């Protein structure tokens, strides 16, 4: 057994190093330390058998073999038939004879003796070997320090004074009370960031400052930062060195040093922390002070934003540039309804007036910025055209309107600025549907037309603000009762009873008389002849694209003649009792869009305008029996 083989073989670090340098075929090196220690640093090409209590108990009970404990990469060496030398090491064992019988290393050695012919223990363990031959050790690289502000301090017991800047030192109470050390470094100013640390006897009161705070999570260090920075700058102006210290030089004094770097070097709190940490790795401000450093960083950014341009005094807004004498004021775009009041106020404060009046008192910075922004507002011609292309909508309720003495020359294009419209023609039940009467905007409007109370008047032509959507409603009830129903067939639905005809059976005409559905080769278009067939017309009738020209009027006359035929030849519907009920409620809703027309043509150019327009419409005719 292994316990009978005494004394046990040993191997020193030099011999193991020579064997490892010999290349492949060397001894099997077993690391008996914990997995954490092995993973951090271990001998080159060694394998680990973790020294846990569970592994120790299972080895003692014989429930696990050495081959099962060794990593798969080195298992081939264990299972080899050729003789294999084994070297075992722990952390620092120098003499195997002093090992306890129940120790993990003793149990492991006894089990290895049963599997291998030559088992030796490394003298001095890994500590001796790594110090003599660090190049023959390997492991994962040391983890980088976390880059956050809350990284822990390194275990440096005593680092002494640390020079952060040529005139700034960081230290502890022990360093400050060492007069020789202070004199050697030429330090004559002391900033004490504690309540309990005494003042050095060799430092005068004028060169000593105390920040009475404790290192806990309730102290407020932020109010003292500016005073501390002024004290450090005072020492710098005197060409002297200053030391900032607390009890250990880790938390409170380090916070003040970080704040000084932030203020003087323009660094962020994170960068300033790393700057000081690189020079004194033991610093570790508590989270309370770290949070106050973040608040101090925000205050510095706010101060820099308020100061703005270095050439402009802080707190004094730069006055807006005033135009030269006799020079015209910059033209402002037409104010909208939302900015009219603001624009007027800005215009009153915009500098010298044309009469040479003195400028108004300086306005607050926000008002000056608003005035400059308003002066720079300009709308391009494309934006103006896009504004004019917005849809407008209005509705007309028409019973009948006819003015024989008034005859327009022809329908013309809409007024400038009045772009594509949404038209809705709606007549109540029992009223005749005819051509719409001129709108109040048209010069041919009938004088007897009376607007409905809810109609919104059109804004004056000179008004700069115009709503993109207009609503208009007209009621011609009185005109319908005073004027005859003649010449209203231009927009009447085909097949309806003509003027002056009694309603007979089958008053509704078949849909074959209706205008054809618009198609690519026969789209909707305007009909000038139909427009001239009635008085007081605002909108031209619509027909097929093949109809414009002289043929359009002849088609309408043929439809009039067809409607003039006796109605008794048609059967199917009972006769209407009264002329007032001949025409029933009909609705027509049309929506069309058209581009802006540069040259406003009249009369003969209407057909070309209709071809340029894109039209979509729907007609619904309801006959109530």
UniProtKB/Swiss-Prot annotation:
Matches recorded under InterPro entries: Dual-sp_phosphatase_cat-dom, DUSP8_DSP, MKP, Prot-tyrosine_phosphatase-like, Rhodanese-like_dom, Rhodanese-like_dom_sf, Tyr_Pase_AS, Tyr_Pase_dom
Chain spans, region Disordered: 306-586
Top-rank EC class of the record's enzyme: hydrolase
Subcellular location field: Cytoplasm; Nucleus
Keyword Hydrolase attributed: yes
Biased composition (Basic and acidic residues): 380-389, 555-570
GO molecular function per UniProt: MAP kinase tyrosine phosphatase activity; MAP kinase tyrosine/serine/threonine phosphatase activity; phosphatase activity; protein serine/threonine phosphatase activity; protein tyrosine/threonine phosphatase activity
GO process annotations (BP): dephosphorylation; negative regulation of MAPK cascade; signal transduction
Residue ranges, compositional bias (Low complexity): 431-448
Active site feature: 246 (phosphocysteine intermediate)
Entries under Gene3D superfamilies matching the protein: Protein tyrosine phosphatase superfamily, Rhodanese-like domain
Domain Tyrosine-protein phosphatase: 160-302
Catalyses which reaction(s): O-phospho-L-tyrosyl-[protein] + H2O = L-tyrosyl-[protein] + phosphate; O-phospho-L-seryl-[protein] + H2O = L-seryl-[protein] + phosphate; O-phospho-L-threonyl-[protein] + H2O = L-threonyl-[protein] + phosphate
Expression across tissues: Abundant in brain, heart and skeletal muscle.
EC number(s) given by UniProt: 3.1.3.16, 3.1.3.48
One CC-aspect GO term: nucleus
Database matches in SMART domains: DSPc, RHOD
Span of domain Rhodanese: 23-138
TM helices/strands, residue ranges: none
Keywords in alphabetical order: Cytoplasm, Hydrolase, Nucleus, Protein phosphatase
Quaternary structure annotation from Swiss-Prot or TrEMBL: Monomer.
Protein task: Has phosphatase activity with synthetic phosphatase substrates and negatively regulates mitogen-activated protein kinase activity, presumably by catalysing their dephosphorylation. Expected to display protein phosphatase activity toward phosphotyrosine, phosphoserine and phosphothreonine residues.
Family classification: Belongs to the protein-tyrosine phosphatase family. Non-receptor class dual specificity subfamily.
Full protein name: Dual specificity protein phosphatase 8
Provenance organism: Homo sapiens
Gene: DUSP8
């Amino acid at each position: 057994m292994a316990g009978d083989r005494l004394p046990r073989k040993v191997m020193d670090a030099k011999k193991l190093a020579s064997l490892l340098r010999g290349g492949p075929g060397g001894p099997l090196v077993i690391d008996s330390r914990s997995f954490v220690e092995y993973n951090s640093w271990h001998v080159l090409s060694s394998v680990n058998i973790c020294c846990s209590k569970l592994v120790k108990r299972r080895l003692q009970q014989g429930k696990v073999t050495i081959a099962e404990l060794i990593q798969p990469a080195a298992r081939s060496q264990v299972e080899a038939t050729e003789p294999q030398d084994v070297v075992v090491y722990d952390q620092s064992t120098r003499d195997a004879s002093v090992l306890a019988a129940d120790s993990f290393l003793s149990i492991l050695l006894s089990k290895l003796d049963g599997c291998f012919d030559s088992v030796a223990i490394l003298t001095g363990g890994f500590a001796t070997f790594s110090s003599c031959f660090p190049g023959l050790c390997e492991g994962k690289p040391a983890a980088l320090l976390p880059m956050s502000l809350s990284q822990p301090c390194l275990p440096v017991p005593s680092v002494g004074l640390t020079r952060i800047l040529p005139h700034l030192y960081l230290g502890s109470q022990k360093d400050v009370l060492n007069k020789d050390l202070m004199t050697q470094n030429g330090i004559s100013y002391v900033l004490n960031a504690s309540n309990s640390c005494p003042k050095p006897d060799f430092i005068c009161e004028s060169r000593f400052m105390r920040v009475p705070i404790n290192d806990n999570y309730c102290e407020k260090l932020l109010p003292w930062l500016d005073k501390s920075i002024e004290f450090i700058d005072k020492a710098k102006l005197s060409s002297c060195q200053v030391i900032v210290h607390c009890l250990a030089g880790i938390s409170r004094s380090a916070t003040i040093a970080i704040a000084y770097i932030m203020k003087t070097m323009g660094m962020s709190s994170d960068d300033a922390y790393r700057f000081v940490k690189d020079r004194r790795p033991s610093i570790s401000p508590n989270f309370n002070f770290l949070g106050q450093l973040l608040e101090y960083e925000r205050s510095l950014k706010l101060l820099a934003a308020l100061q703005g341009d270095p050439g402009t005094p802080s707190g004094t807004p730069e006055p807006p540039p005033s135009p030269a004498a006799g020079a015209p004021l910059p033209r402002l775009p037409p104010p909208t309804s939302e900015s009219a009041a603001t624009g007027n106020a800005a215009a009153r404060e915009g500098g010298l007036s044309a009469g040479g009046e003195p400028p108004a008192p300086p306005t607050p910075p926000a008002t000056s910025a608003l005035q400059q922004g308003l002066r720079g507002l300009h709308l391009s011609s494309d934006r103006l055209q896009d504004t004019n292309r917005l849809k407008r909508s209005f509705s007309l309720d028409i019973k009948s309107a006819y003015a024989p003495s008034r005859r327009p020359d022809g329908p013309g294009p809409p007024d400038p600025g009045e772009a594509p419209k949404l038209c809705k023609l709606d007549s109540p039940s029992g009223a005749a549907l005819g051509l719409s009467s001129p709108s109040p905007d048209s010069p041919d409007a009938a004088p007897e037309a009376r607007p409905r109370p809810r109609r919104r008047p059109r804004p004056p032509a000179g008004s700069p603000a115009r709503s993109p959507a207009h609503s208009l409603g007209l009621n011609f009830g009185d005109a319908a009762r005073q004027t005859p129903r003649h010449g209203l067939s231009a927009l009447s639905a085909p097949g309806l009873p003509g003027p002056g005809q009694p309603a007979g059976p089958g008053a509704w005409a078949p849909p074959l008389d209706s205008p054809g559905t618009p198609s690519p080769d026969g789209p909707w278009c305007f009909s000038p002849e139909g427009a001239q067939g009635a008085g007081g017309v605002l909108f031209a009738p619509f027909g097929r694209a093949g109809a414009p020209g002289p043929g359009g009027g002849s088609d309408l006359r043929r439809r009039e003649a067809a409607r003039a035929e006796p109605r008794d030849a048609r059967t199917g519907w009972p006769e209407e009792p009264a002329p007032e009920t001949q025409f029933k409620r009909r609705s027509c809703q049309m929506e069309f869009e058209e581009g802006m027309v540069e040259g406003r043509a009249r009369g003969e150019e209407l057909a070309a305008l209709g071809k340029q327009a894109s039209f979509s419409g729907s007609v619904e005719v309801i006959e109530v029996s």
